[in-house]
Amino acid sequence: MNFYLKKVEKRIKEKNYDVVIDYSSNLLKYKDFDIAIPVFAWVHFSLTFGEQLSADKIEKYKKQYKKYDKILAICDTMRNEFVDILGMDKTKVELVYNPINLKVIREKAENVNPDYEKYLKENYFLQVSRLTQQKQPEHLVDIYYKLKQRGIKEKLYFIGNGEKVELIKQKIKEYNLENDVILLGQIENPYPFFKNAKLFVHTAKYEGLPTVLLESLAFGTPVVAYDCPTGPKDILGGNSEYGELIPLNDKDMFVEKVYELINNNEKYENYKKISLIRADDFSMESNKAKLKELIENTNF
């Protein structure tokens, strides 16, 4: 056991904590790490990322997680992985969402940088993420091009940076979308853009529990997203109750659902209203109450 973990062990014993919550899922792999209180692993990633796990990998995960008193999963899909793949008892794996501070982000949305005011006056679709292979942002340019051919007027904004920027620029040039697809780069406070967006659009090929979807719901901004492993289904509902869920990598379906949504005012307004209600399920208050209940019901 390294020096850092020895310090952690000493501090835990000195402070007489009730529970330790391990975000790394690595704390209990050290045999000489010895504390006599419950330890929860709060898992923020998929075990599979949509891939088939090898027998060796499954066995490794079983050994790693069986030592914990509770597993906290941030979405139902992850929770099911522990039960279905690792064979864990359902009572040991609890659902505790990654919370968002609704009050703070809504306050930040009112603080508008004058440099961005002209962009916020436009009608636009929004994507906020690292522009990487995982997020597949180039899919959105292809989708947007087809929507432009069908007559939509909204622009498409990207907030973020990453290795896919050059590919996006190439596609923008290829499709002659220089005036319609805007790369805004990294922005310290993106929340005014969340608040004013017509739609939030998301084409990742895998996720954990994507915070950007929750932040969109917090402003009543309807979401259209790929049904990737894991997260979007847990947020938007398996039957698209809280936003449009699109089969993974189905660009044509994505085009159809976006076009339908912006031309169906009743459906659009319903998503705006229900998004705000859904966001409350992921609030700090809801998750604090859940954690408090779990700790109080743990046998010490």
What are these regions (language model features)?
Residues 222-226:
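Short hydrophobic beta-strand element within catalytic cores of glycosyltransferases
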Residues 4, 21-27, 43:
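Short His-centered aromatic/hydrophobic patch
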Residues 6-11, 54-73:
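Membrane-proximal helix-turn-helix segments that form the acceptor-binding/catalytic region
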Residues 77, 99:
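Carbohydrate-associated surface elements
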Residues 186, 205:
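Aromatic "clamp/platform" in nucleotide-sugar-dependent glycosyltransferases that forms part
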Residues 253, 260, 267-281, 293:
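A short, well-ordered alpha-helix in the C-terminal region of glycosyltransferases
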Residues 123-146, 152, 163-169, 252:
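A conserved mid-protein helix/loop that constitutes part of the nucleotide-sugar donor-binding site
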Residues 237-252, 260-265:
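Conserved acidic donor-binding segment of nucleotide-sugar-dependent glycosyltransferases
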